[in-house]
Curated annotation (Swiss-Prot):
The lineage of its organism: Bacteria, Pseudomonadati, Pseudomonadota, Gammaproteobacteria, Enterobacterales. It comes from Escherichia coli O6:H1 (strain CFT073 / ATCC 700928 / UPEC). Belongs to the glutaminase family. This is Glutaminase 1. The modification N6-acetyllysine is found at residue 294. Substrate binds at residues 66, 117, 161, 168, 192, 244, 262. It catalyses: L-glutamine + H2O = L-glutamate + NH4(+). InterPro entries: Beta-lactam/transpept-like, Glutaminase. Gene3D superfamilies: DD-peptidase/beta-lactamase superfamily. It is an enzyme of class 3 (hydrolase). Homotetramer. Keywords: Acetylation, Hydrolase.
């Protein structure tokens, strides 16, 4: 049994130590994100048996952004299976920025990872759907099943994203021209943009992690969301590419599958045990929350979790 006092103490200490850490800046290329108050910070644990511990602004709702890629990858694995995802999208780190097109050019137009923009757009196109709205509703539903029913699209975030997503539209057309997109290019880009524009809070984000930690069963609803056999593929991708250019450093220092988003959220999974999540808007140059990384790493270190430890 996990010690409840120790878990609450871990989140309290992480928050106290790092919630006002200086450094980083909000994402400024998406107008909505640029205007989120930079002083906000939160950290939370949800255990695989459904206990919740949090500190800070844990009820504040922020844009899910790239963490949504984890949810869409999970749905694609359910729909088409791990082999098809690997064959049609890939399962390798790019070593390049999350929105780079260079990796596409170097590999004949094939994306390498579902957790960078090109691969995520391709993954969105793999979802079984007869039309745009069905594709979107299925992705929203998997987000809600994994994290909580309150997860919903923000029209304000979506509008802010849709009017600035020219680079992603270009990526979609490159994928389409190379034969690695499996629906209309602009449909894929539209739905991908929507999936990034949902709002979540830190406890719900930790619940998403706890659902993965529990082998695909949401510990708060007790409902199976994913096949247990598909979860290791998700965690492997998170370990390889979840924090973009910081992924290797994260694996080296923290040793947990993780995923960040430019909305300021960051998630880590302790398989079989818990999800750890944090939120704070200022980002490092790779697009990861400066305070969030520190808070999640602090919780993991205090509790002694690292998947590479014996």
């Amino acid at each position: 049994m996990l010690d409840a006092n120790k878990l609450q103490q871990a989140v309290d200490q992480a928050y106290t130590q790092f919630h006002s850490l200086n450094g980083g800046q909000n994402a400024d290329y998406i107008p909505f994100l640029a205007n989120v108050p930079g002083q906000l910070a939160a950290v939370a644990i949800v255990t695989s048996d459904g206990n919740v511990y949090s500190a800070g602004d844990s009820d504040y709702r922020f844009a899910l952004e790239s963490i949504s890629k984890v949810c869409t990858l999970a749905l694609a694995l359910e729909d088409v299976g791990p082999q098809a995802v690997q064959d049609k999208v890939g399962a390798d780190p790019t070593g390049l920025p999350f929105n780079s097109v260079i990796a596409l050019e170097l590999h004949g137009g094939k994306p390498l990872s579902p957790l960078v923009n090109a691969g995520a757009i391709a993954t969105t196109s793999l979802i079984n759907a007869e039309n745009t709205e069905q594709r979107w509703q299925r992705i929203l539903h998997i987000q809600q099943q994994l994290a909580g029913e309150q997860v919903a699209l923000s029209d304000e975030v979506n509008q802010s994203e849709q009017t600035t997503n020219f680079h992603n539209r270009a990526i979609a057309w490159l994928l389409y021209s190379a034969g690695y997109l499996y629906c209309d290019a602009m449909e894929a880009c539209d739905v991908y943009t929507r999936q990034c524009s949902t709002l979540i809070n830190t406890i719900e984000l930790a619940t998403l992690g706890a659902t993965l930690a529990a082998g695909g069963v949401n510990p708060l609803t007790h409902k199976r969301v994913l096949q247990a056999d598909n979860v290791p593929y998700i965690l492997a991708e998170m370990m390889m590419e979840g924090l973009y250019g910081r992924s290797g450093d994260w694996a080296y220092r923290v040793g947990l599958p993780g995923k960040s988003g430019v909305g300021g959220g960051i998630l880590a999974v302790v398989p079989g045990v818990m999800g750890i999540a944090a939120f704070s808007p200022p980002l490092d140059e790779e697009g990861n929350s400066v305070r969030g990384q520190k808070m999640v790493a602090s919780v993991a270190k205090q509790l002694g979790y690292n998947v590479f430890k014996g």
